[in-house]
Amino acid sequence: MELLPPLPQSFLLLLLLPAKPAAGEDWQCPRTPYAASRDFDVKYVVPSFSAGGLVQAMVTYEGDRNESAVFVAIRNRLHVLGPDLKSVQSLATGPAGDPGCQTCAACGPGPHGPPGDTDTKVLVLDPALPALVSCGSSLQGRCFLHDLEPQGTAVHLAAPACLFSAHHNRPDDCPDCVASPLGTRVTVVEQGQASYFYVASSLDAAVAASFSPRSVSIRRLKADASGFAPGFVALSVLPKHLVSYSIEYVHSFHTGAFVYFLTVQPASVTDDPSALHTRLARLSATEPELGDYRELVLDCRFAPKRRRRGAPEGGQPYPVLRVAHSAPVGAQLATELSIAEGQEVLFGVFVTGKDGGPGVGPNSVVCAFPIDLLDTLIDEGVERCCESPVHPGLRRGLDFFQSPSFCPNPPGLEALSPNTSCRHFPLLVSSSFSRVDLFNGLLGPVQVTALYVTRLDNVTVAHMGTMDGRILQVELVRSLNYLLYVSNFSLGDSGQPVQRDVSRLGDHLLFASGDQVFQVPIQGPGCRHFLTCGRCLRAWHFMGCGWCGNMCGQQKECPGSWQQDHCPPKLTEFHPHSGPLRGSTRLTLCGSNFYLHPSGLVPEGTHQVTVGQSPCRPLPKDSSKLRPVPRKDFVEEFECELEPLGTQAVGPTNVSLTVTNMPPGKHFRVDGTSVLRGFSFMEPVLIAVQPLFGPRAGGTCLTLEGQSLSVGTSRAVLVNGTECLLARVSEGQLLCATPPGATVASVPLSLQVGGAQVPGSWTFQYREDPVVLSISPNCGYINSHITICGQHLTSAWHLVLSFHDGLRAVESRCERQLPEQQLCRLPEYVVRDPQGWVAGNLSARGDGAAGFTLPGFRFLPPPHPPSANLVPLKPEEHAIKFEYIGLGAVADCVGINVTVGGESCQHEFRGDMVVCPLPPSLQLGQDGAPLQVCVDGECHILGRVVRPGPDGVPQSTLLGILLPLLLLVAALATALVFSYWWRRKQLVLPPNLNDLASLDQTAGATPLPILYSGSDYRSGLALPAIDGLDSTTCVHGASFSDSEDESCVPLLRKESIQLRDLDSALLAEVKDVLIPHERVVTHSDRVIGKGHFGVVYHGEYIDQAQNRIQCAIKSLSRITEMQQVEAFLREGLLMRGLNHPNVLALIGIMLPPEGLPHVLLPYMCHGDLLQFIRSPQRNPTVKDLISFGLQVARGMEYLAEQKFVHRDLAARNCMLDESFTVKVADFGLARDILDREYYSVQQHRHARLPVKWMALESLQTYRFTTKSDVWSFGVLLWELLTRGAPPYRHIDPFDLTHFLAQGRRLPQPEYCPDSLYQVMQQCWEADPAVRPTFRVLVGEVEQIVSALLGDHYVQLPATYMNLGPSTSHEMNVRPEQPQFSPMPGNVRRPRPLSEPPRPT
């Protein structure tokens, strides 16, 4: 025993009550997402043109005299549009061979090739002429020249010129065959007075065989526009690689002294063709030569700032280029890229593969490659290859274009000739150029399909088209973790992908999507997607946004006042929403446009806040409370002190913020007023305080009750001027822990709200601290009494009793009694320890005073009074013996008094048996004397003690003797009639199933008499005789039944199974399970019951010590083959290994020399659970019934852990032993699911199925799992709570599957707690994966049992609940039997049967 030091003042209060911060403490303004300041669902309508077919190519022209045009090519047609996208001219480009083909006619009379549609592959401008050149997929890929003829601001096309000379072209050498049907990219460069076409085409074996295209070539346009000059330079994929090595040319452009092509191609001619990467090919724009052709691998990766687990070190690669564009960059991006402003940068959108499928990162990434750096890397690669010393083994590469070679040798040569230069041959630079995603993965799921980059002011903007037909205009920056959107809008409702090629015309970009061409302003389509004034005026200057009343727009869109210099403040929330009419309130305003500087400093006189008629004085911002706001969120806070004026009235009012004379910020100044409703002035009222006394140590939990106690932001409870620590604040109640007092005295107690005292006069009395000196006894059980002795025990409002087992603590409060002694009850605690009790510390505390702890306190299970009637005394007996489970274990903990007829007897305990010698002075009359047992002050009359006199026998005893005699006579008469009839049939029914083994197998099957569940010889009911096969006889075959109660068992005649025929290795393995048949005595006239697989007899087993042990013997009649016998023996070996208090153990298996196997099981004197709960003589409580289910759950949890599936869990298959412990039985035919996942009953076509206990999926698929056992457990709980009512009694078994599939389930029984019915519903979930496990069910049912206070929760009537009319065999009760009335009212608590026995 030890004394505990005093606790902190509020410790006990915090134990009893969950802590809750007072109103106003640490309140923060709700963050407004940054996305809330914009709306990307705003519809913008931009000019568009419908081309009449999928747009294949597009190019724009701007002349020197303000003439401009847009050229749009679709299949078989070329459109000429004006700058407003109005059609100016249309030209037929196909089909080839069609008389209406205008371009075909330019080549003279045909035929010029095979007929077919013309898909435009090349559409470029020759700026020198100027002229438009188009090349299609027909006519061997020839091109046509269209001179441009300006007509005002519009442009027309002259008659086309055919760039094809028949006499200069032949199949093996065709300089005028330019376009490939697989795709061609062309860039036109003016050199001197000539135009050179830099052409790159995708090839395969079929295209290469049709005419003579080239992969890369430089062709000069003839001056007479008759075609291209022969003898052009070219590179082509070698014929041996045409099948496996495909090159896609994505983009081409000209800048500075070079022309560049961007390709997607396999990484190597020897590797997997699907392993792609991106390359940049560079050609000289000043010399039409290919000797300085260079390639460089571009590497784009996504490398997040915080690398994900499992991600590669260098970031996730995105090797496939989807679209690219080059442009000069603005100052900000140039600084981040470490280049000069205005330098050209190549931007590319990359994906993970050809299909652009999602990876672990974003769908698309954007990388930037400065052109100067690209050229530098290429030049350095040339130096490494051609300048000494050359690294050995350095390859020239491009093996798909040329013969393999090592640097510095030319292709195909082993040495460099003096007349040749290493630099005059194509080269793949050995190093790659690597960059990371500019957007750091922020594009996320967006799939970018088009890209165009522009410089606006100092800002670099990427204009991107997406797979779903949207346009994103985003500022390109690297230093942010969010996207700076100029706009994000949809081009239309079709949602078709935006195509790769984008053209610019003046201040507009032309995007193509499906058959539409859209004209999008570079500055964005508008400003309406900005929703707040602050966001509107912070937009880029080039957008021209301004605030127009209550919306953002461009000046041309605003009919009223439009300005760009100021915004009003905006209130969105404030706290608190109420304040005291007297006293101050610290008011926090939330919103935007309060400040324009990060410091949040408010100049004097700029901000005015009024609440109703009362001013609110601005407070300086507390820098210690400043918290960083994520850039994706925004919120501003403003605090002021509100002190109501004397004229302020109680009630609701408005909060108003006015900002004037604020100095301008970077983008605008704040000026205006914002008003928000919802504040109320209230008058707090204190009505009651309790308790008004407590110990000097403090810690007393004060409860202050009243009205409007939570108004404002500050309140204080003062006890003698010292603050009482608040633990909970609500509108009607305050809870606090008193501070320590200096002396024993009465001190003032007051409440202040907002610094003003609430009217009322209260006094608190400090008393002497309670001192606990002892706690007794040192053991007990739930709700048993504990005595606390000490001094000043009534100084505390309540003493608290706490039990701690080392892991958790439970508490109960003691009611006030005497200052020196208090009687308390132990708290609720469930003992789960296998030893039957739990040791821990029992403590007593009084508020904040020092406590007392009793170590080593033993917590025991509560005792359970018996429910069986007392046995009459024999004449020679002078003591009463009765069983009282758990009473002996608690004898040292509580007071126990046993009386007979009001006279006390000197009782003694022998385990759970109580022996009570009768007092000598006791006279037992004819009606006997009542036996009463009082335990810890609670008394129960267990029955009446009677002793039969010599003059007569009590009527009840006489009936008990005569009724069995009459039943025996009736049984003998029935047996004689049956024997006579059987002899006439010349068949003898053997007395047990042993003799059936020798019957002739060809004789067929003979049915046994019907034995219903509970057809037990011990019940005194005779077995009905059979006169032939009646309507109850089973038809041999597959069938369904509600339960095995209604089944009959046919006996199969079969050949004898010899013990010597069994596998010797198996017999050796199961020798510990087998019991010699000489040690087993079967009482074949004592039938306990029957099942589908056999009959159960009462028997005896003689162990090795010659002790006769009662047992139940189950003879199996359905095993017909030797393999089944061997399988049964192996299963018996598994069953022998099961050991759990709630699982029926297997004594052994007896296999006679000739005959069928017999199973020996422990004898259960109380029979099965169904018979028990249906019996009118039993009176279990709700807690008893649920505890039976808890024991079943524990047994099933064990079987599930052992990987057994029961398949037939029901109340009829659970047994009760002499201590009323439930044992799960009839799992012997369960299948070990270690062998296979589930067991199919289709393997046993004669098995009768307990369909009304089966899970839905078992009814549908005939498969069983542990989760189908969980369903059956739910039905078993329903049986228990209805005391054995048949489930689905009005549903035909063949309709049950449809009934359950509709979601319908068994109704909630009348006395079933809601929490238990919820457990049943969880067991009946249609999806087996959603059902709980048995481990979870054990925990949930344990909680339900522990929540039922006491052992006797509700008195159940002895009549059956929820049962309609039924046959006698369904109820296991004859219809003529009288109903039993409820227990007499003077019986306070019947003997509960629920708790399993605990070892003492």
Curated annotation (Swiss-Prot):
Q: Which domain of life is it from?
A: Eukaryota
Reaction equation(s) it catalyzes: L-tyrosyl-[protein] + ATP = O-phospho-L-tyrosyl-[protein] + ADP + H(+)
All copies of domain Sema, residue ranges? 31-522
Q: What is its main location?
A: membrane
Which stretches make up the IPT/TIG domain?
Answer: 569-671, 684-767, 770-860
Q: Name one GO biological process term.
A: innate immune response
| Expression (tissue specificity) | Expressed in colon, skin, lung and bone marrow.
- Topological domains on the Cytoplasmic side lie at 979-1400
* Cleaved signal peptide residues: 1-24
- Give me the disulphide-bonded residues: 101-104, 107-162, 135-143, 174-177, 300-367, 385-407, 386-422, 527-545, 533-567, 536-552, 548-558
Q: Which residues carry this modification: Phosphotyrosine?
A: 1238-1239, 1353, 1360
Q: Which SMART domains match?
A: IPT, PSI, Sema, TyrKc
Q: Where is the protein localized?
A: Membrane
Task: Name the UniProt key words of this record, in alphabetical order.
Answer: ATP-binding, Cleavage on pair of basic residues, Disease variant, Disulfide bond, Glycoprotein, Immunity, Innate immunity, Kinase, Membrane, Nucleotide-binding, Phosphoprotein, Receptor, Repeat, Signal, Transferase, Transmembrane, Transmembrane helix, Tyrosine-protein kinase, Ubl conjugation
Do you know which InterPro entries this protein is assigned to?
A: Ig-like_fold, Ig_E-set, IPT_dom, Kinase-like_dom_sf, Plexin_repeat, Prot_kinase_dom, Protein_kinase_ATP_BS, PSI
Recorded hits in Pfam families, A to Z, give: PK_Tyr_Ser-Thr, PSI, Sema, TIG
Glycosylation sites recorded in the entry for this protein: 66, 419, 458, 488, 654, 720, 841, 897
Query: How this protein is processed and modified after translation, per its record?
Result: Proteolytic processing yields the two subunits. Autophosphorylated in response to ligand binding on Tyr-1238 and Tyr-1239 in the kinase domain leading to further phosphorylation of Tyr-1353 and Tyr-1360 in the C-terminal multifunctional docking site.
Record topology, Extracellular segments = 25-957
**Protein kinase domain boundaries:** 1082-1345
Q: Topology relative to the membrane, per the entry?
A: Single-pass type I membrane protein
Quaternary organization: Heterodimer of an alpha chain and a beta chain which are disulfide linked. Binds PLXNB1. Associates with and is negatively regulated by HYAL2. Interacts when phosphorylated with downstream effectors including PIK3R1, PCLG1, GRB2 and GAB1. Interacts with integrin beta1/ITGB1 in a ligand-independent fashion.
User: Could you say which protein family the record assigns here?
Assistant: Belongs to the protein kinase superfamily. Tyr protein kinase family.
Instruction: Tell me what disease the record lists for it.
Output: Nasopharyngeal carcinoma, 3: A form of nasopharyngeal carcinoma, a malignant neoplasm that originates in the nasopharyngeal epithelium and includes 4 subtypes: keratinizing squamous cell, non-keratinizing, basaloid squamous cell, and papillary adenocarcinoma.
| Name of the protein in its database record | Macrophage-stimulating protein receptor
Q: Which organism is it from?
A: Homo sapiens
Name of the coding gene: MST1R
